C-alpha cells in the first residue's frame, strides 16, 4: 500500500473524501445536461464501470433546472461544474447537487460568493476549488510571467481564503495542468501548503491512447508520493474509458480494494494458444467485479504457474489443453476448448467467497 498523506475529511453525498478513506474515482458526462434521459443513461454506464462521483456541466439555466430530475434517477454523488454565474450554483444546490465546483474569485462580488457559501452550508454541500494552469488570474500571470506551480498554489490559497473568511471549510482543491511536470510540482506544493483533500487530474491529456499514457505518468508520480484523495482521468474518449483507466492506475499502487486485476504474459514464440484474445475476454469478464481478485492468463505451461504465484486463479495454456491453478498450485488440466469457461466458473466462485467475506467483516465492524 502506498503511503497516503492524511487530509481533513469532506462529505460528498454518501461518501467521505479525504481523511483515511480510499481514493475516489470520478468522471464527467459528455451529454448536454438538460437532456436528462441521455445524461442519466451515461451516468448509469459510468456507475456500472466503477465511477463513484460524477460531474456535469451547468452552463445555463436549463442545465441547472435538470439537476433535480437527474438526482432522482442515479445512485452516485453528483457534482455541478459552475463558471461565473453564481445563480446557477444556487439553482443546482436547490436541486439537490452533492458538490459544487467553482472558483470563488470568478463568481463576482462578495455578496454573490456569500450567497453560494450560505446555501452550501445550509445543505452540507462541499465546494471544489478548481485551479487550472490554463486559466490563472491575470495578476498571477503578470507576477510569475507564465503558469508556474507557485502561481497555481497562490491562486488556490487566494480562493481558499475567500471561503475561510466566510467560515466555510468543506473544501476540496484541484491543481490541474496539461504539462505533466507542472502538475506534479503543483500538487506536491499544494499538499505542503494546506490539508484540504486534493482532486487529481492531468487536464487536456489527449486521446484514449496518448491521454492514458500521459495521465498514468503524471498521476502515478503524484500517487506514489502519497498525494491525492480523488481523481479523474481526462480523455478525449467515452468517459467509461476514463473510469477503466482510473481503476487500473489505482490497482497498480494498491489503492483499490474493490477491483479485479488481470495478470497476463506478453506472448512469445512458445505460445500454443490464442492468448491475446483470451486475455481480452477475461479482462472484460472481470472488469465490473467489486472484489480484489487476481486472475492470471499465461501462455506457457512450464513457467506459467510459477510466474503467477500471487494470482488467486489462473490458466496456463499448452497445446490442446490448459492448466488451471490457484495460488501457483495446479488444480487440474482442462481441454483447450473449455478452459476459458472453466476459468470463469472458478472466478465466480472465488469472487462470491470474497464478497461474502467482506460482508461478514462489515457486519462485525458495525456490531
Swiss-Prot record:
State the Pfam families in the record: GcpE (PF04551)
Q: Which cofactor does it need?
A: [4Fe-4S] cluster
Q: Which UniProt keywords apply?
A: 4Fe-4S, Iron, Iron-sulfur, Isoprene biosynthesis, Metal-binding, Oxidoreductase
Report the coiled-coil segments: none
Pathway this chain belongs to:
Isoprenoid biosynthesis; isopentenyl diphosphate biosynthesis via DXP pathway; isopentenyl diphosphate from 1-deoxy-D-xylulose 5-phosphate: step 5/6
Q: What does the record note about the cofactor?
A: Binds 1 [4Fe-4S] cluster.
Q: Name one GO biological process term.
A: isopentenyl diphosphate biosynthetic process, methylerythritol 4-phosphate pathway
Where [4Fe-4S] cluster binds, per the record, is at: 265, 268, 300, 307
Under which EC number(s) is this enzyme classified?
A: 1.17.7.3
Q: Which reaction does it catalyse?
A: (2E)-4-hydroxy-3-methylbut-2-enyl diphosphate + oxidized [flavodoxin] + H2O + 2 H(+) = 2-C-methyl-D-erythritol 2,4-cyclic diphosphate + reduced [flavodoxin]
Q: What would be an example GO MF term here?
A: 4 iron, 4 sulfur cluster binding
Q: Which family does it belong to?
A: Belongs to the IspG family.
Function noted in UniProt: Converts 2C-methyl-D-erythritol 2,4-cyclodiphosphate (ME-2,4cPP) into 1-hydroxy-2-methyl-2-(E)-butenyl 4-diphosphate.
Q: What is the name of this protein? A: 4-hydroxy-3-methylbut-2-en-1-yl diphosphate synthase (flavodoxin)
Q: What is the taxonomic lineage of the source species? A: Bacteria, Bacillati, Bacillota, Bacilli, Bacillales
Amino acid at each position: 500500500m502506498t503511503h497516503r498523506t492524511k487530509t481533513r475529511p469532506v462529505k460528498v453525498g454518501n461518501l467521505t473524501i479525504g481523511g483515511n478513506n480510499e481514493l475516489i474515482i470520478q468522471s464527467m458526462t459528455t451529454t448536454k445536461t438538460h437532456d436528462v434521459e441521455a445524461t442519466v443513461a451515461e451516468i448509469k454506464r459510468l456507475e456500472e464501470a466503477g465511477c463513484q462521483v460524477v460531474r456535469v456541466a451547468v452552463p445555463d439555466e436549463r442545465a441547472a433546472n435538470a439537476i433535480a430530475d437527474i438526482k432522482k434517477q442515479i445512485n452516485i454523488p453528483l457534482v455541478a461544474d459552475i463558471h461565473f454565474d453564481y445563480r446557477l450554483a444556487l439553482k443546482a444546490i436547490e436541486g439537490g447537487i452533492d458538490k459544487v465546483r467553482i472558483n470563488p474569485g470568478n463568481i463576482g462580488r462578495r455578496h454573490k460568493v456569500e450567497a453560494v457559501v450560505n446555501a452550501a452550508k445550509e445543505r452540507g454541500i462541499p465546494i471544489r476549488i478548481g485551479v487550472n494552469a490554463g486559466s490563472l488570474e491575470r495578476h498571477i500571470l503578470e507576477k510569475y510571467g507564465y503558469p508556474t506551480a507557485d502561481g497555481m498554489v497562490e491562486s488556490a490559497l487566494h480562493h481558499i481564503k475567500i471561503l475561510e473568511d466566510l467560515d466555510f471549510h468543506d473544501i476540496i482543491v484541484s491543481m490541474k495542468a496539461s504539462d505533466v511536470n507542472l502538475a506534479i510540482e503543483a500538487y506536491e506544493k499544494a499538499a505542503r501548503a494546506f490539508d484540504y483533500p486534493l482532486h487529481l487530474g492531468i487536464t487536456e491529456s489527449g486521446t484514449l491512447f496518448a491521454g492514458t499514457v500521459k495521465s498514468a505518468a503524471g498521476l502515478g508520480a503524484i500517487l506514489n508520493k502519497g498525494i491525492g484523495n480523488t481523481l479523474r482521468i481526462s480523455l478525449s474518449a467515452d468517459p467509461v474509458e476514463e473510469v477503466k483507466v482510473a481503476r487500473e492506475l489505482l490497482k497498480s499502487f494498491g489503492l483499490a480494494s474493490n477491483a479485479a486485476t488481470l495478470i497476463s504474459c506478453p506472448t512469445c514464440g512458445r505460445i500454443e494458444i490464442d492468448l491475446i484474445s483470451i486475455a481480452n475476454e477475461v479482462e472484460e469478464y472481470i472488469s465490473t467485479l467489486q472484489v480484489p481478485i487476481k486472475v492470471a492468463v499465461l501462455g506457457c505451461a512450464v513457467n506459467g504457474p510459477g510466474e503467477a504465484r500471487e494470482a488467486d486463479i489462473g490458466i496456463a495454456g499448452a497445446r490442446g489443453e490448459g492448466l488451471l491453478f490457484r495460488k501457483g498450485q495446479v488444480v487440474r488440466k482442462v481441454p483447450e476448448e473449455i478452459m476459458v469457461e472453466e476459468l470463469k466458473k472458478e472466478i465466480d466462485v472465488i469472487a462470491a467467497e470474497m464478497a461474502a467475506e467482506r460482508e461478514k467483516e462489515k457486519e462485525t465492524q458495525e456490531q
